[in-house]
Amino acid sequence: MPSIQLCLFASTPEMAELNFLVKVLTGTPEELARRAVAWGYDGIEFMPDPERVPEPGELEKALKAAGAVMPVVNTGRMAPQGMALLHEEAATRRRSMEAFKRMVDFAGNFGARVGLGVARGPGIPGAGPEEMERMADQVFRELAEYAEKARAVIMLEPADPGVTSYINTVDEAMAWVERVGSPAFGVMLDTYQLAEAEPSIEHGIRAARGRANHIHLYDPSRWPPGVLPDKDRLDWTHLARVLREERFSGSGSVVLAPEGDAEQAARKAAEFLRRLLAG
């Protein structure tokens, strides 16, 4: 398998107050970059505050000093901060589009990709398929056009029904990628979604048809891979084999352990994944 950049989910200190779905590394840009490399990773998947996206200079300096990378900007903080790209209220949609575009601009400074997952929202109560489709078409096309100009790439992330009612499978995400037809609008994978929303993990990975170049790597238990092997629900060896067959390349991001020694677990996960993906 081609080399994959391993990253840690990372954000600023106040992230800890948001009760996010998974636990992430928090700290200053310098702390994030330094710890990620020290713990065995190539860099970070950064989750900025969508309402106060930082200037890129400080993070750029920190990454360079640590020898780290930041290939992906995660927009997941939009959800707990009350934003949704697909929302019944026009004011919320405008606020959300503005926030997402700020993160696209931020990513463009690094030549990075931008995940579009829970940022689209849980779905609109009472909205029919045609209404959701019209709204999504407008939003996705506008964002793709914006990303092209910003020299960034948006990655549509399917999510399980517990997170959103709209775009749950890789097949659905790929239909949108084909429909939008922009080089700045692609797809990404997530192992939790693959386990919860696909006919099989293999089906989900292959449905991306080699177009995905980023994957979230964690067990449905929300633990990082290889830390609690007796409790893992995923067959990581099988997953790695399918990724290899699909010639997956790019980057993969890992969460922190939800409890216990975060550093020890992160180091163990990095060692496990490097052995697994080198196979």
Segments (PLM) and residue ranges:
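N-terminal pre-domain/capping segments
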Residues: M1-G108, R141, S182, G210, ...
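Histidine-acidic metal/acid-base catalytic patches
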Residues: M1-G40, I167-L189, A195-G279
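Active-site-proximal loop/turn and secondary-structure-junction residues that shape catalytic pockets
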Residues: A10-E14, P48-P50, G76-A79, R120-P122, ...
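Active-site acidic/histidine proton-transfer and metal-coordination neighborhood
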Residues: V22-T26, L85-G186, E196
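Conserved beta-strand positions in the central sheet of alpha/beta enzyme cores
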Residues: E45, V72-N74, G115-L116, M155, ...
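Short Asp/Glu-rich motifs
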Residues: E55-P56, G82-M83, G126-A127, Y166, ...
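Catalytic-core regions built around general acid/base machinery
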Residues: E58-G67, V139-Y146, G204-A207, H238-V242
